[in-house]
Amino acid sequence: MYTTGLIGKNINYSESPEIHNNYYKKNNIPFFYKIFNLKQDQIDDFIKNLHKNNIKGFNVTIPYKETILQYLNDIVYPADKIGAVNTVAVQEDKLIGYNTDYIGFIKSLQYYNIQVKNFKCLIIGSGGSAKCIYYALKELNARDICIVSRNPEKARLKFEKKVKILNIKDENKLDRYDLIVNCTPIGGPNFKEQKPIELKEIKKNCVVYDLNYTPKRSKLLKEAKENGAFIINGEKMLIFQAYSAIGLWCLNGIKGGR
């Protein structure tokens, strides 16, 4: 039996163990999935003991999607371009990084039949998830992508020079956007009573996507719905990225073995 899991900070709310373990059981995969709540100074020991603990792969969430890069031997496209990894496969002598969030986001849009070609898009946040969503929207030929951040100067170091980056306090013309994506933890399980931005005026039929999936309808999504938006939470993205990660681990684990 191989161990897989999720590393992050304050992540006991995660639905990943249920999704993964149900899939393993249904498909007779000899894996088990668990939560690894880690402080940053515990990551070194976690990595050193991967083989000892029979860990074949793991997912990475807030706030370590960029931190994990320093531990990897190889980073597979598009994770190398994005600069963030959320899935790691453990081989005999290598750690291979992937970004299955990228795949999960694109598949979730396909699931809801949302075509973002020529869309004007607003990304809230500038961390690893935001970078992933930015490159996914570029791949899907979104016409214009703007990023808002609490720290735009720091955010500019993470993105292409041509990307429009604004202070979140200065962006109040939301009716120009066809798609708004929240890539911050604000509104999620650790910040349920907060919103990352006010949605006072949004375009009719705007799509508002909150990557948080707990609660199912965040304060941001509730306000968006009241203003006529089509709303999506991060649950389908979570499921699709999980299945993609499992495929990578099975390829390395069951077929490659140790």
Swiss-Prot record:
It catalyses: shikimate + NADP(+) = 3-dehydroshikimate + NADPH + H(+). The active site is at 65 (proton acceptor). InterPro entries: Aminoacid_DH-like_N_sf, NAD(P)-bd_dom_sf, Shikimate_DH, Shikimate_DH-bd_N, Shikimate_DH_fam, Shikm_DH/Glu-tRNA_Rdtase. Keywords: Amino-acid biosynthesis, Aromatic amino acid biosynthesis, NADP, Oxidoreductase. It holds the Pfam family Shikimate_dh_N. The keyword Plastid does not apply. NADP(+) binds at residues 125-129, 211, 234. GO terms for biological process: amino acid biosynthetic process; aromatic amino acid family biosynthetic process; chorismate biosynthetic process; shikimate metabolic process. One of its GO terms (cellular component) is cytosol. Pathway: Metabolic intermediate biosynthesis; chorismate biosynthesis; chorismate from D-erythrose 4-phosphate and phosphoenolpyruvate: step 4/7. GO terms for molecular function: NADP binding; shikimate 3-dehydrogenase (NADP+) activity. It comes from the Bacteria. It is an enzyme of class 1 (oxidoreductase). Shikimate binds at residues 14-16, 61, 86, 101, 213. Its EC number is 1.1.1.25. Homodimer. Involved in the biosynthesis of the chorismate, which leads to the biosynthesis of aromatic amino acids. Catalyzes the reversible NADPH linked reduction of 3-dehydroshikimate (DHSA) to yield shikimate (SA). Belongs to the shikimate dehydrogenase family. This is Shikimate dehydrogenase (NADP(+)).
